[in-house]
């Protein structure tokens, strides 16, 4: 389960252009593939959502949407249980302690996007309830760094 959630967070970070890429066309095309229980859960969890676009994989049902002007992505397992939600945030949203660690450990890297992932702790309490993923780039490499609840900056994945 932890691996699925971390994969979800990574996929969300890498798919920066998901809203622009499909122009919202998938909303009606894939709606029939979304399980009824997931649609009901999503409507209850995010009743004010607009610009809803669903994607189904073999492990999860993902929905990109806008709520109160903020783009978010929610993830549900195939049984309809809410796994978590991601959204892009400003770099200043992560703790100052973490920013300092990133500056020390990743000199020469520039901050790209930052995603906050808020998990359904009731479903899996082995994972931090709130985790930040910071995309860092230099001329040769791109890495994802995970910021834990305790403020630790940990290498998560080599992107390039």
Summary of predicted features, one role per range:
Residues 1-25, 42:
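Bacterial Sec-dependent N-terminal signal peptides
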């Amino acid at each position: 389960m932890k691996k699925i959630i971390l994969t979800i967070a990574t996929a969300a970070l890498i798919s920066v252009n998901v809203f622009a890429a499909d122009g919202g066309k998938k909303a009606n095309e894939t709606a029939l593939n979304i399980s009824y229980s997931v649609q009901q859960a999503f409507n209850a969890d995010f009743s004010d959502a607009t610009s809803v676009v669903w994607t189904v994989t073999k492990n999860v049902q993902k929905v990109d949407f806008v709520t109160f002007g903020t783009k978010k992505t929610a993830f549900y397992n195939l049984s309809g249980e809410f796994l978590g939600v991601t959204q892009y945030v400003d770099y200043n949203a992560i703790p100052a302690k973490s920013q300092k660690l990133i500056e020390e450990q990743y000199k020469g890297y520039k901050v790209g996007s930052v995603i906050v992932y808020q998990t359904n702790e009731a479903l899996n309490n082995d994972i931090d309830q709130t985790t930040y993923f910071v995309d860092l780039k230099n001329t040769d490499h791109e890495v994802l760094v995970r910021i834990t609840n305790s403020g630790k900056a940990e290498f998560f994945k080599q992107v390039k």
